């Protein structure tokens, strides 16, 4: 049986670490040409086959809360970061594709953001990083 006090301490520590890391990492976006939410959309889209994803998958994979992903995507279309078209397999759905400009903007910021993440995590050993990843996945699965 899980020790309730220990569970609460672990939860608080995890939440505080996430908050502090996020507060620090948000600085990566200060001079960027992408918002955090736009980066998040492009993260999902650029990792998808042919740099194309269903809008519902983009919404489900958002790491940052976004009340209206559809409106965000429409703004990104206007900026030339993504293209949006009807999903031929789902009449009500849409497909989102990263444009070359969107892919370039994403990769530029991803290099900066990736360095920040690597720097912040560098005080952990590889086995600790694997354990952290595995524990986080276990928590997500419930």
Language-model features: locations:
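Charged, amphipathic alpha-helical coiled-coil/dimerization segments
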Residues: 22, 74-137
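N-terminal helix-turn-helix DNA-binding core of bacterial DNA-binding proteins
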Residues: 23-65
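Alpha-helical hairpin
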Residues: 3-6, 34-36, 98, 124
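Short amphipathic alpha-helical segments with heptad-repeat character
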Residues: 11-15, 19, 63, 103, ...
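N-terminal leader segment of winged-helix/HTH proteins
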Residues: 1-32, 79-81, 138
